[in-house]
Amino acid sequence: MGESASTETLEKKQPFTAEEEAADGKKSHRSVVAVQPKPRKGILSSTIDLIEKVIVYFAHDSSKPLHYLTGNFAPVRDETPPFAALTVHGSLPVCLNGEFVRVGPNPKFSPVAGYHWFDGDGMIHGLRIKDGKATYVSRYVKTSKLMQEEYFEGAKFMKIGDLKGLFGLFMVQMELLRAKLKILDVSYGRSTANTAMIYHHGKLLALSEGDKPYVIKVLEDGDLQTLGLLDYNKRLAHSFTAHPKVDPFTDEMFTFGYSHTSPYITYRVITKDGVMLNPVPITIPEPIMMHDFAITENYAIFLDLPLYFRPKETIKGKLIFTFDPTKKAKFGVLPRYAKDEQLIRWFDLPNCFIFHNANAWEDGDEVVLITCRLKNIDLDLVNGAVKEKLENFSNQLYEMRFNMKTGAATQKELSAPMVDFPRINENYTGRKQRYVYCTSFANIDKVNGIVKFDLHAEPETGKKVLEVGGNVLGIFDLGPGRFGSEAVFVPREAGTRVEEDDGYLIFFVYDETTGESKVYVIDAKTMSPEPVAVVDLPCRVPYGFHAFFVNEEQIQKQQAEI
């Protein structure tokens, strides 16, 4: 905070040199690592399995229902190869030529004991669109974890759903023992790659925040092939967020990883040529869960929120991450090309947690963050046993402002509960924009609509439910018994010279009455209740997490570069 303004300007405006960017450039093609784990079967493996079964039988409460293995959360065990000539009601716009993908948890094998929604193996559901025709495909991300469990024909890695009480400590020891005895090969990590996807430098990445990215290739017929693990020529030695940011103006990618050992946060910049630059450790007092962050043209914004990694709490029957309602929410704003953390500015706001940010930008002396703010968080709500209610889970759209000159921080409520999974026209990432599209929720985990917000309009404060009016321009209601997932905005044209909301929203929908899954395409400008197109799918698509649209140009560029 004591640095001069001229120093701060130099740090935030100066990009890395050409020499730094090119340091590993000639090796960039080798940054995809073929995943070839070497687990071992034998007497030791069988003995540990037997011990585990006995302990689970006596120590695990199997009477508790595993909610996220039932209904449309239940996995589909089989992959679906490209299924072409799908029925399309309406017409698919030309700008949707490409592949719409959504990843989510889909456990291939039944859990040994507990199960949390975050635990399942990553399965990608894709809709290849070309010239008005659609093809559906689903494929597992071929992670090291999945390969090894296929080898054993059963679950072997511990799960978040197990990590409660003394039983949780036992399950941790079981995995450590299996790794020590080389029964499990953890040299390629433990990733499920089940959370989100992003495209950068000719590569489509499947992400989960506990490990490194997996590279997915989109084939011409829409099929999805796992190429391997991305370690940026061994420069990535820590976890990698599920929500990195790509600046559409510079083609750079910005990311971070969090850890339960110091440094708890590590910030990274990846050049437009796919070179990962030196790590920037971020100092915070305790290890936390930090699911998302944000960038502006000149800054990166870090969220030190009080969801702490506290293993001792598991003895009390809590999960390994515990929310502390007595602590302030802290936001760190760092010049995004900083070589270290010396120029970071920290701002305090009232206690909260944030899973997902919409966008951020600079407005005079202020840095503005648009986010979905949660007053409290209990990860047990997405554990095995869950009440399908919204009580104690009040996610709302907020505007937060951090004044880089005065050090003041303010926040403003922009919506009634409950909204999340905010998406924008990503041509505006890191720049001032107007429209945000969020999912609305019928209960803790089921999406019942898509809401369009106008950040230029004043919100109607005091409302308990979401209604059109004020800053709510439109709500697309899925109707009774139908539930969706994150909607991705696809612009009619690239760039920022056309109207920001001129485009379409595309998302998966499941009808719990008929058991049918579909893909909806709606007009993002008008939010008309009549979809532009509906595509009938050949099989059930379980509820999942984040989605992405790979356009035709990216598919062709990807095929040329990988």
Swiss-Prot record:
Q: Where is this region: Disordered?
A: 1-32
InterPro entries assigned: Carotenoid_Oase
Q: In which tissues is it expressed?
A: Expressed in leaves. Detected in roots and flower buds.
Record key words, sorted: Cytoplasm, Dioxygenase, Iron, Metal-binding, Oxidoreductase
UniProt-listed GO biological process terms: carotene catabolic process
Pfam families in UniProt: RPE65
Q: What is the name listed in the Swiss-Prot or TrEMBL entry for this protein?
A: Carotenoid 9,10(9',10')-cleavage dioxygenase 1
The catalysed reaction is: all-trans-zeaxanthin + 2 O2 = 4,9-dimethyldodeca-2,4,6,8,10-pentaenedial + 2 (3R)-hydroxy-beta-ionone
Residues that hold Fe cation according to the record: H243, H291, H356, H546
Q: Where does this one sit in the cell?
A: Cytoplasm
Q: Which gene encodes it?
A: CCD1
Record's miscellaneous remark: The carotenoid cleavage dioxygenase 1 (CCD1), which catabolizes carotenoid metabolites, is up-regulated in the floral tissues of the White Jade cultivar, resulting in a pure white flower.
